[in-house]
Amino acid sequence: MISYTSLIGLVLASVMFFCVPKLSKLEKPPVKKEFFKSFKDILSNRQMNYLMLISMMKSLITNSSCILLPFLWKAMGHSPFYIGFALFLFVFAGAFSSFLSPKAEKLFGSKPVVYFSMLATFPMMVLFALTYKTHSVLSLVIFFLIGFTTMLAQPVTMVWAQRTLPEYKSIVAGFINGFCWGIVALCMSILGAVAQNCGIMKVLVLLSIVPAISSYFVKFLKEKKNESD
C-alpha cells in the first residue's frame, strides 16, 4: 500500500510540474563549452585553487565532527536522542550562518568573513575538548558555535569562486560543493582509523588547526565584484 507520505510527495511533485514556469522554447540554447577545457581552466586558476582549499577545510571540520563525534558520545553513554539533538544543532547552526553569510560579507567584506571562519574554529574546538566530559550542556552550545563558524564562509566561498570564473558558474559550483567535499570524504576512512588509535578528540583538535594554518592563503585572494553590483 502507498503510504500517506508518498501521496503527499506525489501531490507536491504534481504541483511543481504544473506551477513551475517552463523554459521558453524561443530561448537560445546555452553555448556549450569544451568539457576538458573548462576543467583545465578551473584547475589552472590559482585563485580557484585557494578557494577550493578553503572549501576543503570547511568540509574537513564539518564531516569529521558529524562522523566521529557520535562514536565518542555513544562511548560516553549518551542517549541516541542526545546525539541526534547535538547533530541537529550543528547542522541548524550551519544553515543559519549560511543565511547570514551574505549580510556579514556586505558588512565586513569577504576576506574578514573567511578569516574569522577559518581561525575561530580552533579555539572553539579546544573549548569543546575541555568541556564535553564535565559540562555537557555548555559543550553543546560550543558545538553549535563551531557549526555556525565553520559554515559561515561557505556561501562566500561559492560566490567568490563563481565571480572568479563567471563563464563556468555551474561547473565551479560542482567543484566547490562536490569535488572538494568528495576529496575530504575519501580521507575520512584514514582519519577514522587514526581516531580509533589515537583518540577522537585529539584528532578533531589537530584537524581544527589545519584551517587556521590554511587561512594564510586568504591574503592572496583578489576581490571580484558581481556584474550586477
Predicted feature residues:
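Helix-loop junctions on the cytosolic side of multi-pass membrane transporters
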Residues: 16-30, 219-229
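Symmetry-related core transmembrane helices of the 12-TM Major Facilitator Superfamily/SLC fold
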Residues: 1-18, 203-220
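Extracytoplasmic gate region of multi-pass secondary transporters
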Residues: 46-98
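Helix-to-loop junctions at the C-terminal end of transmembrane segments
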Residues: 97-110, 195-196
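Hydrophobic transmembrane alpha-helices of secondary-active solute transporters
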Residues: 12, 54-63, 90, 94, ...
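C-terminal transmembrane helical hairpin of 12-TM major facilitator-type secondary transporters
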Residues: 109-157
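Juxtamembrane intracellular "pre-TM" segments in multi-pass secondary transporters
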Residues: 20-54
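A late C-terminal transmembrane helix in Major Facilitator Superfamily
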Residues: 162-200, 207
